Amino acid sequence: MIQDFHQMISAALGISERQISQTLGLLEDGATIPFISRYRKEVTGGLEVQIESIKTHYEKLSETAKRKETILNTIQEQGKLTAELQKRIEETWDNTLLEDIYLPYKPKRKTRAEAARQKGLEPLATLLMLQREPHPEERAAGYVKGDVKNVEDALKGARDIIAEHVSEDERARNSVRNAFARQGILTAKVVKGKEEEATKYRDYFDCSESLKRCSSHRLLAIRRAEAEGLLKVSISPDDEECVERLERQFVRSNNACGQQVAEAVQDSYKRLLKPSIETEFATQSKERADEEAIKVFAENLRQLLLASPLGQKRVMGIDPGFRTGCKVVCLDAQGNLLHNENIYPHPPVSKQKEAFAKLQMMIESYKIDAVAIGNGTASRETEEFLKHQRFNRDIQIFIVSEQGASIYSASKIARDEFPDYDVTVRGAVSIGRRLMDPLAELVKIDPKSIGVGQYQHDVDQTKLKKSLDQTVENCVNLVGVNLNTASSHLLTYISGLGPQLAQNIVNYRAENGAFTSRKELMKVPRMGAKAFEQCAGFLRIPDAGNPLDNTAVHPESYHIVEQMAKDLGCSVAELIADKELRRKIQPERYLSPTVGMPTLKDILQELEKPGRDPRGPIKVFEFDKNVRTIDDLRIGMELPGIVGNITNFGAFVDIGIKENGLIHLSQLAQKYVSNPNEIVSIHQQVRVKVLSVDTERKRIQLTMIGVSG
């Protein structure tokens, strides 16, 4: 069966069976996706993003295999498992078809057909199905006894048995299924009396569109409204055509028996078949929409986590506000809290001179290099206030997304970090740290609270969590972490660690001081050879005695670099420092049965830029000073903005006011765009033009087409 899995995954993904087999072997051996992707390229044939797809396909096939086992056991217990049926089940890997095969044998709650069978009406149903008897009423009279009160009662029971038979027939189900697939219409109507409550869904009050053309965001919006009891939703094909197809299959005579069967077919379609297939399509379309939404969310999260960091600078974090003032914190270059203060530069208090004096004192005393202002209430006013002041030090001012900061400030992680401070201080610290290192700070927050998803509360939560966790893990390992400063929460996402080992590393660091080498990791309690293999390459030690400990070169490959240095008559440190020496390296000399060119290329790239951060430098940004509210917007106005969220129908842009504007997919570029990520990315600075403004619904339509500069 495992070999069958390899063949099926290979066919589905267009990857060789050998690559599938090797990759699954590594996964089964406990290797993580980041480790395999980075350090086992020779084994997998250079697979990267496909590794996750291989794992997902394998898990789905394994689930199907378990389901088949359950089905076979159930039918076996009924004594109905024939060799032919067993072979058919074993050869079927399509879940829908598998359930169709199983349906006649599936244990049921008491149905109308089952009740009719218990009354002894199955022979009558069989007689009707043969459609040879000219006078079925006369034959039905012989069944009038006990609970069967009259002839019509007998015929009705027989029709119920036929209706169930029709609904469980594979060909019949496929016929109706094909009709749904080709011509299924999704219809939504507002629930009577709920018009006012459902205002935000008014686009769907009387909606009718092809299911196969319905975009995922529309489908999820409709399903959300349905769940809230505001819309009635249905999916339907051409009912007449479906019934005609079924009648052609089951009705073979125009006589009285044929008429009974035709009546049973119509009942079967309306009462059993159509609702069953409608549920199937509702589930499948929702699953597809979920997958698309989760994919969008994961990509947005990836871009957000890989946003450019300011780095190890002294930062002032400000959580702005009007009535309650602005909470200000000062952080050292490692993000440790040095000081916190409240200032009140805005109405109703308006103590601007006092606020400036406090800021001046903090900036000088703590040698602040940059200020991070949260982008919530009073953000623009606070930015403007700071930019109008002349401080004795040059400082850069940044606007930082504070989405999820309040969630973090009330979390256990925040309480453990700052047990003696309230939520306002913790929130301001989070804003400051997000500027220094977005990745290290955002991993502390449930990704669903970061606000870059599309209907994230409506999709399958288990699948969403799995995808987002894998995204965080991929990002953390792509960047790597400083072994001597990383929090236990950040370390948790490092390949091969997890919560317990991450905490053990932090405890070891607290008791023994900073790590001086990667080898020292082996002294951490419960750190075995396998965990070390998986994590070591992603952990950096900037001041280590061995310079390779601050690179992505894995300890298992140190001997290769050492041999390169030896062959050139220099030390490893000299090799890293001297570009001319590195040019003399002939990588093919270091090939071996276990080390191929992919690994050697990665090593040489790492020696070129040891410990390189893939995230790039941060840029300062300014909003238009003349736009403060939605009422300041005019059609045709051009504005600077920052992409805050991406969906499959476009991108939402922060233009410095409370409401974000939407650039629809069709307005991202002159050319056809199928995926917004082809044009924009999270946190990208863009220039946009205002297309329309709906102040009542707080909706702003923007375009990037025909924008100057």
Model-identified regions with their sequence ranges:
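Generic start-of-chain signal for non-secretory N-termini
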Residues: M1-S21, E28
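Long, highly charged, low-complexity intrinsically disordered interaction regions
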Residues: I2-F5, T56-L81, E90, D416-A514, ...
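Short, ordered loop/turn segments at secondary-structure junctions
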Residues: Y39-K41, M129, D238, P320, ...
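Duplex nucleic acid-engaging cores and interfaces of nucleic-acid transaction enzymes
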Residues: Q50-S53, K60, T64-G317, R323-Y421, ...
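Structured, non-catalytic alpha/beta "coupling" segments that mediate domain-domain communication
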Residues: T74, E99-I101, A225-D238, R248-L273, ...
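A glycine-rich phosphate-binding loop feature that marks nucleotide/adenosyl-phosphate handling sites
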Residues: N178-I185, I318-F322, G376-E381, V400-I407, ...
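Single-stranded RNA-binding regions, centering on S1/OB-family and related RNA-binding modules
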Residues: I541-G709
